[in-house]
Amino acid sequence: MAELVVALDFPAADVAVDMAGRLRGTAPWMKVGLELFCAAGPDVVRAVADLGFRVFLDLKFHDIPNTVRGAVRSAVRSGADMVNIHLMGGERMARAAVEGLHEGAQTTGSVPLLFGVTVLTSTAQGELPGISTDIGEYAASLAASGAAWGLNGVVCSGYEVESIKKRCGASFLCLTPGIRPGGGAGGDDQRRVMTPAQAVSAGSDYLVVGRPVTGAADPAAAARAIMAEMAAVRR
Amino acid sequence: MAELVVALDFPAADVAVDMAGRLRGTAPWMKVGLELFCAAGPDVVRAVADLGFRVFLDLKFHDIPNTVRGAVRSAVRSGADMVNIHLMGGERMARAAVEGLHEGAQTTGSVPLLFGVTVLTSTAQGELPGISTDIGEYAASLAASGAAWGLNGVVCSGYEVESIKKRCGASFLCLTPGIRPGGGAGGDDQRRVMTPAQAVSAGSDYLVVGRPVTGAADPAAAARAIMAEMAAVRR
């Protein structure tokens, strides 16, 4: 059953934690991204987890292997249930992240999910320096590498889920950002957006929604409506 | 005159701030990387800056443009004097980072330096998924893009400084990690290491040294010895 992840895209902890509080009893996951984490640090992860949510710490690590191993270890110890890395960082970095995941879990007692970023969903064909191959094919080949390197799944556009599942197996998880009830570009960076129903039909396991929930007049109602749309899709 | 940056590669704030305290009056810069920042958040940047150091917040942002803009803004507001992004993130992301830099500086009153990561110094030829061109050439072309997109400089191996300066001009700054007094691989990730004297001779503007200082019996003495070696090089 696909799960909803609400992106807490706020510049400060108080507003983010307040929003999470208003969403209790709706989506099971909250996402803490770079802007919020750079402003608030690991305390905001703990605060959101303490409200009963599972937390996706979306920092997209991309550094030398030893640093990524340490960063994942720290992220796990902060209470994150899901973390991610860039697969463009290569095999040694990815395997170091897997090691950091398990080292961190020795402190917390549970092993979080480790996702790989293939191609950012904001990236259009021709925008990847040095990469001339088809962007969908490049993303699928990175996903296959991620599966081979021991990751749990990948962040990818809804349009790539089917080919990734075919190539990496149904149990290899897909998390899809840029979900928009009613589809249509939201005027932000996401280039390849989908509706919740489309993404669930495509086979995505986690759907990330930001402004359409957190910017709604009644965020909890908006979240419940999206979850109802998701549940109505027969897979 | 090239400047020394000491990498505070520690898993917790107390140890890192203690080390910075022991290094007062030696290196002008301290570096806070992903592992320390994920454990401690922006408070550690302020604590190190309050000791009188300039702080390089080395998080290597690589996300959708809007998120990187917000992350750089938050990083600047935390008191960082230098931040960095991956140039593999492309032009839109890089230009969004430049916007975030100036937005953040409206709060702090000074515009930090924005550096681009070309190819991680831990990456060997053939390890970059989808990139078959020569790694030095790929790094130099990314550096040229970074200069065109408005960055202050790039993180690069000492072996690439000359070609980058030739291509981007002497005022385009180069920061070189993996510096080792006496050279020789240090058993960690860095693949293309140099001595302080070699890096200064090559034209590098900032030299990053980690364990050779922070792991020394007398860190302050180790830092001073490296700075003396740097100063002795005639450019």
From Swiss-Prot, chains A, B:
It is an enzyme of class 4 (lyase). GO terms for cellular component: cytosol. It comes from the Bacteria. SMART domains: OMPdecase. Keywords: Decarboxylase, Lyase, Pyrimidine biosynthesis. Substrate binds at residues 9, 31, 58-67, 121, 180, 190, 210-211. This is Orotidine 5'-phosphate decarboxylase. It comes from Nitratidesulfovibrio vulgaris (strain ATCC 29579 / DSM 644 / CCUG 34227 / NCIMB 8303 / VKM B-1760 / Hildenborough). The gene is pyrF.
